[in-house]
Design a protein with these regions (language model features):
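Terminal or standalone catalytic/regulatory effector modules within metabolic enzymes
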Residues: 1-173
Length: 173
């Protein structure tokens, strides 16, 4: 069992920004630059359409920023891009430096727990997924991780951490 946890830890290697954010967020003096309150993703794939037009995705995101809630929708070539576009519509108005940040790598893996969770529903398509994302602002690169049973939730967690990492220490009320 300890070996399984150790293997999972090393699978998360490269996501140090998420781990550091977990520590920073526990501090009493840390002010989150934004909070994602809700995210809805509408993804449609039409296999009868030409390949370049098959996927139509729209994300609606509700974000709290500076004590105010903002709701916005955006489209993308898939759910990750649609969520990223929606978040940026709101956040770049307040934090223009986020326009420098780009998603460079995106990796999804199943986490196999070797019986830790314990039932067959947690295997295969029902398993936890680990999403690892690498971001860059042209100068620095940082990795984030999201782990959930829902691939979209894990992906959104990565995007949140990636954007928040760029803003850490810059947010003042």
């Amino acid at each position: 069992m300890a070996r399984d946890f150790k293997e999972d830890f090393f699978r998360l290697d490269g996501a140090w920004a998420s781990f550091e954010l977990m520590s920073i967020r526990r501090r009493d003096d840390y002010l989150k630059p934004f909070r994602v309150l809700r995210c809805k993703i509408d993804d449609q794939v039409d296999f009868q359409a030409p390949e370049t037009l098959r996927s139509a995705t729209e994300a609606t995101v509700l974000i709290e920023i500076f004590g105010e809630e903002e709701l916005v929708a955006a489209s993308g070539r898939g759910p990750v891009q649609a969520v990223d576009n929606a978040m940026r519509k709101i956040l770049e108005k307040h934090y223009p430096q986020l326009s420098e940040v780009g998603l460079e790598e995106f990796d999804v893996r199943l986490l196999h727990h070797g019986g830790i969770i314990g039932d067959d529903e947690d295997k295969g398509a029902g398993a936890l997924v680990r999403v690892l994302a690498i971001f860059s602002d042209g100068t620095d690169r940082w990795g984030t991780v999201g782990v959930a049973a829902d691939i979209l939730q894990a992906s959104v967690e990565c995007i949140i951490d990636g954007l928040e990492w760029k803003l850490r220490g810059e947010h003042k009320h």
